Each structure stands twice: as structure tokens, then as C-alpha cells.
């Protein structure tokens, strides 16, 4: 199975996406009341900001962009060095949500305004319940992605060097958006960062290390 997935990285990502979405849907259906409401004093000092919806939604684009960029432009080992801890951390977060269901009571009572930003926040609140929050997957993924940009040597070339500081800015912006939109507590943020740092130091296996060239025929056998 491992050898097959190492030769079919796109299929590996597709299988994991299916697993993740199914697991998250199960959590949303079966865990309606959290055991713990996550909160700290710092949460009360952070104002709500509807404009933070922009970097928050950018997260959904950044993940597949980075994965496919490394898959096609970087040595295959760089792709797996991001993919394995990224998916492992998301799975650990899901397990945490099952073991200790967490939730939030931080959102504003009403989001005022008819502008695009206010409408987007209302749409987010309507579709994303304030449950299963600690650790923050948004934060974990952002930190893990940023570290991949600073690890891979392809971003040392002049034409790509700008992508490293850009990834840092985007990472910080996404993390800030989670608390500015009241989607997460600072505690969720801290544990998301900690999870990313711990998994980054783990001894990950080198999948398909014999393939050191970027992916040209990702689904070839």
C-alpha cells in the first residue's frame, strides 16, 4: 500500500481528503455539545474584525496550492516531507476532538453590514459550528506549510525567494484571522502551533526517495 501511494501521490491526497471530510462530518453530526468551552482572558481583549475573513478563506487555497506546487516543482522528498506531517497532524486534531469535544462561545451575537465581508462572515458562521476547535487545524496547517517553504531548497532560487517571506506573512495573517473572527481561542492557536512544531521534528520516513525529480506523470505506474 505504501509503495502504491508513493507512486500515486495525487490519489494519496484524494483518499486522505475523503477520510478527513468524512471524519469531520461525523464529528459535526455526533458531537453537538462540547465538554469544554475553550476561553482565556486574552480572547476578550481581541476585537472582532470582519475583514479577517480574507486571509481566513485564503487558507483553503493555500493548502492545495502548496501541495501541488511542491509535487510538480520540487524533489519528491520535499512533497512527502510536507504531506506526511500535515495529514498526521490533522488526524491527531480529529482524535483530540473525539477524546475531548471542545467548543467556543466567543462569536458576536450579530454581524452587521451588507458588504461582502459581513456576508462572508455570516455564511461562515452559518456553515461552520463553533465546535471541534482545539487544537486549531487552521493554525496547525498554516505553520506546517510555512515551515515547508523555509525547508525546501527550491525556494532559495532568485525567482522563488520571495515566496518564503510571503508564506510567513500569510501564515501570521491566517493565524490572526482565527482569533479576529472569533473562530478560535488563543489556546487553540497555541496548541496548533505546538503541534506543528512537535511534528516538524519527528523522524518522518522518506517515501519514494529514489524519485528526486519533480512530478511529471503523477499517476503513472
Regions found by a protein language model. Give the residues of each.
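Membrane-interface loop-to-helix entry segments
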Residues: 47-61, 126-148, 186, 190
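C-terminal membrane module of polytopic membrane proteins
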Residues: 185, 191-221
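Aromatic-anchored segments of alpha-helical transmembrane domains
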Residues: 21-26, 90-99, 169-179
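N-terminal transmembrane-helix/juxtamembrane module of multi-pass inner/ER membrane proteins
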Residues: 1-65, 109-112, 221
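Membrane-interface loops
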Residues: 27-42, 72-158, 210-219
Amino acid at each position: 500500500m505504501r509503495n502504491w501511494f508513493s507512486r500515486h501521490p495525487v490519489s494519496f491526497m484524494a483518499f486522505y481528503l475523503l477520510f478527513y471530510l468524512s471524519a469531520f462530518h461525523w464529528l459535526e453530526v455526533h458531537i453537538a455539545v462540547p465538554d469544554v468551552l475553550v476561553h482565556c482572558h486574552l480572547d476578550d481583549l481581541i476585537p472582532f474584525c470582519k475583514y479577517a475573513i480574507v486571509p481566513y478563506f485564503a487558507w483553503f487555497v493555500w493548502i492545495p496550492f502548496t501541495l501541488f506546487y511542491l509535487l510538480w516543482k520540487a524533489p519528491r522528498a520535499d512533497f512527502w516531507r510536507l504531506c506526511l506531517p500535515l495529514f498526521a497532524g490533522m488526524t491527531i486534531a480529529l482524535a483530540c476532538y473525539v477524546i475531548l469535544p471542545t467548543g467556543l462561545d466567543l462569536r458576536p451575537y450579530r454581524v452587521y453590514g451588507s458588504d461582502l465581508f459581513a456576508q462572508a462572515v455570516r455564511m461562515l458562521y452559518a456553515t461552520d459550528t463553533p465546535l471541534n476547535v482545539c487544537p486549531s487545524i487552521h493554525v496547525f496547517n498554516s505553520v506546517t506549510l510555512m515551515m515547508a517553504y523555509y525547508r525546501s531548497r527550491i525556494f532559495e532560487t532568485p525567482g522563488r525567494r520571495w515566496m518564503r517571506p510571503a508564506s510567513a506573512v500569510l501564515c501570521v495573517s491566517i493565524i490572526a484571522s482565527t482569533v479576529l473572527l472569533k473562530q478560535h481561542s488563543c489556546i487553540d492557536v497555541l496548541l496548533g502551533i505546538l503541534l506543528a512544531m512537535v511534528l516538524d521534528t519527528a523522524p518522518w520516513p522518506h517515501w519514494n526517495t529514489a524519485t528526486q525529480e519533480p512530478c511529471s506523470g503523477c499517476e503513472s505506474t
